[in-house]
Amino acid sequence: MERIIDLELRGLETMVAHMCELAHRAISTALHESLHHGDSYDKVRETSDFLMILADQVEDKAVEIILKFQPVASDLRMVKTLMRISYDLARLGRYALDIAYVNKRFNGVRDCDEWIREYIKNMGQKVMNMVELSLASIKDKSLKSVKEISYLEREVDELYKSFLDKIAKDTSESRAIVSSVLIVRYLERIADHMVYAYEALIYMLTGRRELIE
């Protein structure tokens, strides 16, 4: 028999699922524009702002559920986890906006050397893979991608560090260099937040607090 709280929890899940779609779209748009032509800053900003609003609404709804139903065990874990994930998704929107601003202000990495473009394209593909795996896991309430997430996170970290080592040897002073360093940093932070979201999902489904390493 369905409980009254189940309807409220499904509503919370629906809000977070919508945030997943918006965050994915914002990052994909901003990243594509960094390598190609486009003018999506206003659209990404609108999506980012909406994600912040939705995160606040998720928090308000979560608090309302806690006060009204005083959930325990798995119900409480779900409420806390969805609230945490909504924050991570809002941060993804902000990093997408940061990338969109770099695209607008510095022309992305379209004017960078080919090796820089390839570096960011490779790193961006891995980050988008992490985003898609994490968001699918949240939607399906599944932990089957934990090893792949861990592997991709290590790869992104290694790419980030090796890129900084290589770019430090570049003696040119150009807007393109600034742009590339900013974008790889934002990509690295997006990957971090996907790990945080997955760790929160592990807690929700198992009750254990585990770090993905």
Question: Which residues make up each language-model segment?
Answer:
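Cytosolic, long alpha-helical scaffolding segments
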Residues: 1-213
